[in-house]
Amino acid sequence: MKIIVSLFAVTIFFAACKKENATTATIEFIEPLANDTIIAGDSLHVEGTIIGNNEMHGYTLKMVNETTNEVLMNITSDSHASSYAFHEHRMNNVTQISTIAVTISANLDDAGKQATKTVKVVCLP
C-alpha cells in the first residue's frame, strides 16, 4: 500500500509541474518601412529590434533582390539573448528597378522554430 501511495504522490508531483512556455518573439522594423523607395546611390538602412519572452538562439538578417534572385546580404548572429537590436546598411547599386525583400528570422529554440518578418522596398537605378 505504501508503494501505491508513493507512486501516486510522485505522479501528482510530476503532473503538477508546468512546462516552460514556448519562446515567442516580436520583430519590429524601425527602417525600412514597407514599400519605401531607395534612389540610386542612397543606402538601404535596416534597423530594428527583436524582443523575446525567453532566451532566443540568434537571428538572421537577409536581403534578397527579388527581381534578380541575388542575395545581397546574409548576416547571422548565434548569440543567446532575450532581445537583439539590428542595424545594417547596404548601398543601392541596382541596375534595374528592383524589389528588395529584407527578412529577419529569430531562432526561438535549438529545434529550428523561428519567428520571421519581411519588409519589401523598391530600389531605383
Per-segment meaning from a language model:
Residues 52-67:
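Solvent-exposed loop/turn segments flanking beta-strands in beta-repeat/beta-sandwich domains
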Residues 13-16:
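C-terminal motif of bacterial Sec signal peptides marking the signal peptidase cleavage site
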Residues 106-116:
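Short acidic/polar inter-strand loop motif in beta-rich domains
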